[in-house]
C-alpha cells in the first residue's frame, strides 16, 4: 500500500457533512432498506446489512431511523433501487469513481453529468477509470481507544486475515480482501478492539496531485456529486495534501 491515508479524508468529509446530516441519513436509509430487502432483516445472518448498520452508527444515525428502514423492507415495500456506477475525470485529470442507488436512472445520469460538466470535469464511459481502483475492506482503530502497541495490532490484524496495516498518529488503518472483510472485522471486535470505521471502499492504485489552480473546481465537483440524493459514494485518486 502507498502512504494514502483514507482516514484523514474520511474525518474531513464527515465533518463537512454535519450540516447535511439529513441527506446523509436519507442515503443510509436507502442502503439499509436494500440490504435488508435482498438479504433479510437480521444483521447476524446478513453481513451486508450489518456492515451498513455499522456505517450508519459511525455517522451517528439514530437507532429509530435504522429500524424504520429495516421494517420498511420487512413490510414488503415494492420500492427498488438499482446500483449504478459512473466514471470520469475531475479537473487536473484526477480519476473519479461514483456509486449510486437510484429508482430513476435517467435522473441520476443527468445529475451526475451536470455535476461533471459544470465543474470542469468530464464523464467517461464504463471502465474508463474503474481499473485504476481496487475494491478493499477498510477498518479503522482509533489509537486512543486501545492500549495495544503497533506490533500487537499488526499481529492481531495478520491473525484476523487482514492484508495490510498503516499507522498514523491517531489511527490504525487496516485493509482487507473484500471477501474477507466481515471475517476480519468480526475477529478484531472479538479481540477487543473498538472500530472507528469499517466499510468496503475503493482505493486508488496511484494518486494524482490536484493542481493549485484546479483545487476549487475539484472540490466543487466532489460536493456537487455528493449533494445528489442518489449518489452513495464518491471515490477519487486525488493525492493527499501535505
UniProtKB/Swiss-Prot annotation:
Pfam family, one: TACO1_YebC_N
Keywords linked to the UniProt accession: Cytoplasm, DNA-binding, Transcription, Transcription regulation
GO MF annotations in UniProt: DNA binding
Location relative to the cell: Cytoplasm
Gene3D superfamilies: 1.10.10.200, 3.30.70.980
Region (Disordered): 1-22
GO CC annotation: cytosol
Superkingdom of source: Bacteria
InterPro entries: Integrase-like_N, TACO1_YebC-like_2nd/3rd_dom, TACO1_YebC_N, Transcrip_reg_TACO1-like, Transcrip_reg_TACO1-like_dom3, YebC-like
One BP term from GO: regulation of DNA-templated transcription
SUPFAM superfamilies noted in UniProt: YebC-like
Family as reported in the entry's similarity comment: Belongs to the TACO1 family.
Name of protein: Probable transcriptional regulatory protein LBA0733
Organism lineage string: Bacteria, Bacillati, Bacillota, Bacilli, Lactobacillales
Amino acid at each position: 500500500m502507498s502512504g494514502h491515508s483514507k482516514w484523514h479524508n474520511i474525518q474531513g468529509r464527515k465533518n463537512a457533512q454535519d450540516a447535511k446530516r439529513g441527506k446523509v441519513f436519507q442515503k443510509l436509509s436507502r442502503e439499509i432498506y436494500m440490504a435488508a430487502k435482498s438479504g433479510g432483516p437480521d444483521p447476524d445472518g446478513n453481513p451486508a446489512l450489518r456492515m451498513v448498520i455499522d456505517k450508519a452508527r459511525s455517522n451517528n444515525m439514530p437507532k429509530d431511523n435504522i429500524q424504520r428502514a429495516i421494517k420498511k423492507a420487512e413490510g414488503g415495500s415494492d420500492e427498488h433501487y438499482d446500483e449504478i456506477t459512473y466514471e470520469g475525470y475531475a479537473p487536473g485529470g484526477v480519476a473519479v469513481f461514483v456509486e449510486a442507488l437510484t429508482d430513476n436512472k435517467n435522473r441520476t445520469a443527468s445529475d451526475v453529468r451536470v455535476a461533471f460538466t459544470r465543474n470542469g470535469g468530464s464523464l467517461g464511459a464504463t471502465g474508463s477509470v474503474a481499473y485504476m481502483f481496487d475494491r478493499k475492506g477498510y477498518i479503522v482503530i482509533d489509537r486512543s481507544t486501545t492500549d495495544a502497541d503497533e506490533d500487537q495490532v499488526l499481529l492481531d490484524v495478520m491473525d484476523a486475515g487482514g492484508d495490510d496495516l498503516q499507522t498514523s498518529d491517531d489511527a490504525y488503518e487496516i485493509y482487507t480482501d473484500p471477501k474477507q472483510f466481515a471475517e476480519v472485522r468480526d475477529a478484531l471486535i472479538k479481540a477487543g478492539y473498538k472500530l472507528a470505521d469499517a466499510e468496503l471502499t475503493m482505493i486508488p492504485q496511484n494518486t494524482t496531485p490536484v493542481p493549485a489552480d484546479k483545487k476549487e473546481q475539484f472540490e466543487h465537483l466532489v460536493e456537487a456529486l455528493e449533494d445528489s440524493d442518489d449518489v452513495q459514494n464518491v471515490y477519487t485518486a486525488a493525492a493527499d495534501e501535505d
